[in-house]
Amino acid sequence: MYDWLNALPKAELHLHLEGTLEPGLMFELARRNGVALPWPDVESLRRAYDYDNLQEFLDLYYRGAEVLRTEQDFYDLTWAYLLKCREQNVVHTEPFFDPQTHTDRGIAFETVLAGITQALEDGRTQLGIQGGLILSFLRHLPEEAAMRTLEQALPYRDAFIAVGLDSSERGFPPRLFQRVFERARAAGLPAVAHAGEEGPPEYIWEALDLLQVRRIDHGVRAAEDERLIERLIDTQIPLTVCPLSNTRLRVFDSMAEHNILELLERGVKVTVNSDDPAYFGGYITENFHALHEHLGMTQDQARRLAANSMDARLAGG
């Protein structure tokens, strides 16, 4: 079944480029840039990936991102992910990047963007992988910081297909960023947002009504609100679900408890994605395979999930 799932044409719609930083590449970039890591070797770093919640993961994630310094670093990071896309027949990808993670430590916005966009262009021409880039704001930072990032990005507006909202969810509801998303919408940028992962269903309502998102990233806690589920079915607003991430971060205690197939069978437009695959132990095929292994996902369900991902694209092609 793994090989069949791997060959299935897929789109990936919930993927953080910084979350594809594999331990080997992290050490390579650390050596290249003279960055001291707190782990003596790759295996020690792999053992450090034993965290219990979103915040512990984010602490490790931001520490790892410190090795990314130059345009070439961001190119290499993105290119490594695109090679994995080719390996797993991801024909379309719409990755996030978090500019604040880099600009707050002195890396120029233009440096980050240039490396990523060149790799994505090379992915189109050399690998045939289509897609587009999503500019994502860190919700644990103030609204003013997100607005500054948006203003930095607007001169390069054509480099982006949407804006997003990610990072620590609890205590940072979407309504805090309503003005930022209004400004982005005025510039012609559609929106997506992380909601309903650790946060309550109310955050999903806010993302829909206040941020006017076209997709909900995660969204699995929508199942706690029947009226919300009915709205998602009626509007066919997609959920970009990340099964391995959800179990790794204890959104569900085990994969056997995951609700993605229940949502699929009810008519919610759910999709399968890998989120931060270097940290969660698997790329998109591994996520599909986990659903087969633990939930008995059938080939028909896999085809429908893959078709949903193609239908839910924001970028053409």
From Swiss-Prot:
It catalyses: adenine + H2O + H(+) = hypoxanthine + NH4(+). Its EC number is 3.5.4.2. Keywords: Hydrolase, Metal-binding, Nucleotide metabolism, Zinc. The active site is at residue 197. The keyword Cytoplasm does not apply. GO terms for molecular function: adenine deaminase activity; zinc ion binding. GO terms for biological process: adenine catabolic process; hypoxanthine salvage; nucleotide metabolic process. The record marks 218 as: Important for catalytic activity. Substrate binds at residue 276. It is an enzyme of class 3 (hydrolase). Its cofactor is Zn(2+). Pfam families: A_deaminase. InterPro entries: A_deaminase_dom (IPR001365), ADE (IPR028892), Ado/ade_deaminase (IPR006330), Metal_Hydrolase (IPR032466). Binds 1 zinc ion per subunit. GO terms for cellular component: cytosol. Zn(2+) binds at residues 14, 16, 194, 275. Catalyzes the hydrolytic deamination of adenine to hypoxanthine. Plays an important role in the purine salvage pathway and in nitrogen catabolism. Belongs to the metallo-dependent hydrolases superfamily. Adenosine and AMP deaminases family. Adenine deaminase type 2 subfamily. This is Adenine deaminase.
